[in-house]
């Protein structure tokens, strides 16, 4: 059976709706950086997601090609994730004007995948699909201490959940630490094209410090 990050690391991908403090270890991803409203049709964000999945599945299926990745084992492609921020906005109000978003769109990769493997997959996907995948990069993120919980429902209702998370952190002696290297983080467990908007499951994390 293929390795599934969501099942193996439930504390990272299946938290409860009750906020908790958690230490997140360093993880490796493929990533695309961009700006703007993620809901814009055929916009930069949607193109980034398409690029990520193209490279993610090229890596996943690499064992069927002549290219061999040392230590490879079959795995389920992990869910789409995103790091989000706006310049000079450090509270939940950053959600209000989506066209001002900066973002790094992510898909986790197993530890056996290295930078050179991602570079191979970019080249392979470009040749196969006749599209530009050059914005995809290998990205390591050492997230550290966070407040985390599951948000169920519309993405537009996230500020209420974030406020509840922030209050929980502060009531337990932690401060929210949004910086140039620590970001608001979301993991998308549901496909919005196939899921009732009120049942969308999103893991939300906010970086904290004591």
Question: Residue locations for each model-derived region?
Answer:
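A solvent-exposed interaction/effector surface
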Residues: 1-210
